[in-house]
Amino acid sequence: MCGIVGAIAQRDVAEILLEGLRRLEYRGYDSAGLAVVDAEGHMTRLRRLGKVQMLAQAAEEHPLHGGTGIAHTRWATHGEPSEANAHPHVSEHIVVVHNGIIENHEPLREALKARGYTFVSETDTEVIAHLVNWELKQGGTLREAVLRAIPQLRGAYGTVIMDSRHPDTLLAARSGSPLVIGLGMGENFIASDQLALLPVTRRFIFLEEGDIAEITRRSVNIFDKTGAEVKRQDIESNLQYDAGDKGIYRHYMQKEIYEQPNAIKNTLTGRISHGQVDLSELGPNADELLSKVEHIQILACGTSYNSGMVSRYWFESLAGIPCDVEIASEFRYRKSAVRRNSLMITLSQSGETADTLAGLRLSKELGYLGSLAICNVPGSSLVRESDLALMTNAGTEIGVASTKAFTTQLTVLLMLVAKLSRLKGLDASIEHDIVHGLQALPSRIEQMLSQDKRIEALAEDFSDKHHALFLGRGDQYPIALEGALKLKEISYIHAEAYAAGELKHGPLALIDADMPVIVVAPNNELLEKLKSNIEEVRARGGQLYVFADQDAGFVGSDNMHIIEMPHVEEVIAPIFYTVPLQLLAYHVALIKGTDVDQPRNLAKSVTVE
């Protein structure tokens, strides 16, 4: 959600900025822009509505020269998508890019208008530009002006500021929205995501909450909000950006669906030893903390919330630990009672999800036993701020609709369940069954992917549909939720998911020949109950699409399509049955002609409320 790239060097930086923006496209955006300043203080700004490629074409037509620059991809919050609202925003010689939301932008706007400033956009960002300009007019350096301006802003933001009169310096401020400095040789960089800077550096400083950074070609100085200098450690990143080529695939999402067997293998690598789960990466004190856990509270948003919902069944049935799962944006704004010895687990692909981070920070005040992050991005805010962390190791996920990040989150959660069951002294067969299932999972998914053509053919039935209903029971109910989310995200078909036992409590009224009903049906103890629910739909003329275990005993008919799945171990069934629902959503979206990798109005990483 929005992207920032900045650079200060002796060479022209426009192409560095553009490449950084290309690497941030996956986050979602509606417009893009950049501004560069040369050594004489001449500033050139380009902005375009639409894709980064349109901005790059404009830069070819109007070459940009200058060693200092900032660039941005915008996801509209205040003001419609337009070139006028695209960043960077300018106030005379002050140039600003900004991620986040300035909550008090309206009173600041009125105060600045009263001082004679004219606004040319609808954005909250332009307020920052004029405010810094005003403070600079009161005297002092750009850093001093920024230090006076920042306390006047309320909200979550990350901003980078440039003064065309002094092109030897960039100023940056972080409050709730991530910023990372990239360290070079005689040149330095800044971005909202380290992925943007991997072509130019592997050394990074992650700014912490409240940090204000002054960046020149040869130095980086960091201050707190009072102006006192603080030290931040620089780290060497081994993060790989492996998504530049879609290869044989049409979309990143398709590629990432097919990468799941290898992604899960990577998640398991080094974590299973002698038939047991080995999470020694958590550190020497982790076992002591985990052995005290009497309750688990999970916070997440979107797809990560659905993975938390699945794991609740596992934690309670396999490890005997009560577990609650809550949407992070709800948790942070209500008064909650903390259970004794409760472990806070946060789930996020990016590690920068604003509501999840806020929930984690709140949990530190509420007296939780400890915190554990499950994340795909090493060095992210969620990882740095948690007591313990487990990486999913899924590799870079570019498609906005999450696929391999979801299945690898579930893989890590299931390993954690095995670890806790052992620490609780439960029957060793629990861990044995989990390990056996996880080791078999990659090959099981490869088997399932061979059914792609069958699912593609079924997708034709959805081309004229406007609604769909997903059903599941037990730990397959959250998989139904995830299937509905995928379909609505990328095909724009309204989809809902219900626990199948809830059919008679409302959803049955929706059933007719135009309502496709998608069911996940592994061969487990709830199968007979699920078959009764399926018959309720069938009797009312509903069109059924049942993803069923090959041994489940279903017989197809005109209004019931059976997609047979290979039998899988019960413990891994939720992960396995996710994949055909991903493929269904993908093929329906293809038929409908939507933007699969960057669906409308959505962003990969939601870094604002």
Curated annotation (Swiss-Prot):
Note the NCBIfam families from the entry.
glmS (TIGR01135), PRK00331.1 (NF001484)
What does the UniProt record say this protein does? Catalyzes the first step in hexosamine metabolism, converting fructose-6P into glucosamine-6P using glutamine as a nitrogen source.
| Record-annotated Glutamine amidotransferase type-2 domain positions | 2-218
Q: What is this protein called?
A: Glutamine--fructose-6-phosphate aminotransferase [isomerizing]
Give the organism the record lists: Escherichia coli O6:H1 (strain CFT073 / ATCC 700928 / UPEC)
Sample GO molecular function, one term: carbohydrate derivative binding
UniProt xrefs under SUPFAM superfamilies: N-terminal nucleophile aminohydrolases (Ntn hydrolases), SIS domain
- Report the record's disulfide bonds: none
